[in-house]
Regions:
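Penicillin-binding protein/beta-lactamase superfamily catalytic region
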Residues: 181-184, 192-252, 303-308
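Non-catalytic interaction/Regulatory regions outside core domains
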Residues: 15-25, 38, 45-55, 81-89
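A short, well-structured edge-of-sheet supersecondary motif
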Residues: 37-73, 286-287
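Short Gly/Pro-enriched turn/cap motifs at secondary-structure boundaries
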Residues: 51-54, 130-131, 182, 274-278
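Structured C-terminal helix/loop/strand segments within mature extracytoplasmic catalytic/sensor domains
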Residues: 233-336
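Active-site SXXK
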Residues: 67-68, 81-104, 227, 295
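Active-site-adjacent helix/loop patches that line small-molecule binding or acyl-intermediate pockets
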Residues: 17-41, 94-214
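Short, small-residue-biased leader/transition segments that mark boundaries at the very start
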Residues: 1-8
Length: 336
């Protein structure tokens, strides 16, 4: 039995220790980019005119390590609409302002199993909007942003929070904001239905406008990678070294992302990629590997669930090639 114990000990030690060099990560990231770049699957979001006209060949991939080093390949300086990835940022903001339990009580953390803009989900679970990472919960989250009743100061808080997470300021894409405002009929219905169930905590039209504006922020893949890195680094921005939020909130937001980051495809994503990730119809995806790295990718063509085809493929390639994932049980060390 002693021999078996030694074998078990060696196996546990092997499973828990994994060293990966920065050069390996760079090499695999470049492989992923080259592998995916020529893909022609998916199509731009066509229900928002601005997004429909973005160059579908744009593609960028960015990785932020815990030492602050970033790896950037392709169109990582192109500003695209952050769209639903902004839901993660505002979820973090209300977690900072209210604490984890209050957010759970007022919004929730459950996946709906339905499309991100579902009205039916509200009717089925009218006691709470389910999660800040679908449209109903995100609009509710915007209504919670302090100070309640002051749109300008709420907006300042939203932008400041994004700036701290990314290490640099986003820019509002005015054309996208106007395009979204002119076509957000479904979200207007959601906002007022939430009001009917007392699940919105400020003026519904104000909350909807804030949500529409935050989705219209222009951000780069590099900025998004740093934001993912900040979550992975337990709330400390790896580049600026600023403590953006308490470490205790990091697993809360990561659990939300893993549960519903890819909406009704979230289970398939976690099964095949093994890394919590959040998508947006602007083509961006941010992924968080706690304690190791933040990864982001951007490419406009989407699958039927509204997730970037190239971004998914690239991130999945990196995780699988490096043998990384939140469920692997490895203690990963990045070496020079």
């Amino acid at each position: 039995s002693r021999g078996l114990g030694d074998v078990y000990k060696r196996q546990v030690t092997t499973n828990m220790e994994k060293k990966i060099s920065i050069s390996q990560i760079k090499e695999v990231a470049q492989e992923a980019y080259n592998e995916v770049k020529g893909s022609t699957g998916g199509k731009n979001a066509d229900y928002i005119p601005y997004l429909a006209n973005i160059d579908s060949k744009l593609f960028g991939l960015s990785i932020c390590l815990m030492n602050g080093q970033t790896i950037n390949i392709g169109d990582t300086d192109y500003r695209f609409g952050i769209e639903s990835v902004s839901k993660v940022h505002t979820a973090i903001l209300i977690l900072r302002q209210y604490g984890a339990q209050k957010v759970l009580d007022m919004i929730g953390a459950d996946a709906t199993g339905l499309p991100f803009n579902s009205i039916i989900a509200i009717l089925l679970e009218n006691d709470h909007p389910s999660t800040p990472l679908v449209n109903a919960g995100a609009i509710s989250a915007c209504s919670m942003v302090q100070p309640v009743g002051n749109s300008d100061k709420k907006w300042d808080a939203i932008v400041q929070n994004v700036t701290e997470l990314c290490g640099s300021a986003p820019q509002l894409i005015d054309e996208l904001y106007k395009s979204e405002t002119a076509t957000n009929f479904n979200n207007r219905s959601i906002a007022w239905l939430l009001k009917n169930y007392n699940r919105i905590y400020d003026n519904p039209d104000m909350a909807l406008d804030l949500y529409t504006r935050q989705c219209s922020l222009g951000i780069t893949a590099q900025q998004l990678g740093i934001a993912a890195g900040t979550i992975a680094n337990n709330g400390v921005n790896p580049v600026t070294k600023q403590t953006v939020f308490e470490a205790s909130l990091a697993p809360k937001i990561t659990s939300m992302i893993s549960t519903v980051g890819f909406y009704e495809h979230s289970g398939d994503w976690m099964y095949t990629a093994g890394i919590p990730a959040k998508s947006g119809v602007g083509g961006g995806v941010m992924a968080v590997l706690p304690g190791v790295m933040g990864v982001s990718a951007f490419a406009p063509p989407l699958d039927e669930a509204g997730n970037s085809v190239k971004a998914q493929s690239a991130i999945k390639f990196i995780m699988n090639k490096l043998g990384l994932g939140v469920f692997n049980g490895d203690n990963v060390t990045i070496t020079e």
